[in-house]
């Protein structure tokens, strides 16, 4: 099965996102998105980008793109920011709620980035975020380190290719483990009898109509 994944470089255009010194979040987001996308494409994934240039889109437009192309997954790339310089470090992955394959994928991405040296801040539910709430497929938002953390920026810059590969590998690994949920069946009791012959007589009715019957005591 060829999966279709929408990759979103957060912010863009007139919305720079978080800014630290000469660094703009929108630029980091776009660069990482394109590298991750190339790795996924090389592994047979149909990748759709919300943007490949420095343009502005509302979160609603980003979600609309994912819905219109019928994506199987939506992944948005961001950098975090703290009130004070070097106050916090680490990565976190945001999802609508902690359930399903999106939760598994988020945990895999978080763990993969942790192995590179980023502090793991955990997978968190953020149902209020538009790109997580308005998308009709499993959606994740990755906060790849704090843009105003010197240690995070150093790790981000020195291991940019490794960071992209870690994210892409975690995504691909989750997809390879994806299973189809088994359908749910309900048991229907047609009667309870003291005499065996009455039970046998009743049992013939659904059998004649093609339904399997399993007698129990």
Residue ranges and their predicted role:
Residues 12, 80, 193:
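Active-site beta-loop-alpha junctions enriched in small/polar residues
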Residues 3-22:
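Short glycine-rich His-centered loop
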Residues 180-217:
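Solvent-exposed beta-strand motifs enriched in subsets of small alpha/beta binding domains
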Residues 9, 51-52, 95, 190-192:
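Short glycine-centered, acidic/aromatic-flanked micro-motifs in structured strand/loop junctions
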Residues 18, 55, 188:
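Generic anion/oxyanion-binding catalytic loop in active/binding sites
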Residues 2-4, 23-181, 200:
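Active-site-proximal helix/loop segments of hydrolytic enzymes
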């Amino acid at each position: 099965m060829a999966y279709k994944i929408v990759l979103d470089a957060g912010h863009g255009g007139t919305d720079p996102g978080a800014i630290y010194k000469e660094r703009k979040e929108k630029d980091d987001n776009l660069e990482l998105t394109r590298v991750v996308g190339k790795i996924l494409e090389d592994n047979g994934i149909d990748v759709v980008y919300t943007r490949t240039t420095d343009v502005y889109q509302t979160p609603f437009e980003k979600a609309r793109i994912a819905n219109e192309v019928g994506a199987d997954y939506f992944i948005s790339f961001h950098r975090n920011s703290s009130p004070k310089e070097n106050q916090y470090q680490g990565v976190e992955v945001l999802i609508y709620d902690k359930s399903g394959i999106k939760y598994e994928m988020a945990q895999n991405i978080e763990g993969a980035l942790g192995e590179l040296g980023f502090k793991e801040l955990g997978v968190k539910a953020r149902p209020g975020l538009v790109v997580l709430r308005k998308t009709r497929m499993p959606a994740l938002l990755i906060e790849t380190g704090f843009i105003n953390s010197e240690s995070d920026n150093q790790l981000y810059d020195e291991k940019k290719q490794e960071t992209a590969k870690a994210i892409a590998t975690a995504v691909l690994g989750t997809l390879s483990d994806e299973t189809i949920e088994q359908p749910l069946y309900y048991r229907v009791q047609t009667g309870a009898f003291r005499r065996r012959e009455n039970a046998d007589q009743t049992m013939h009715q659904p059998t004649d109509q093609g339904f399997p019957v399993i007698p129990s005591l």
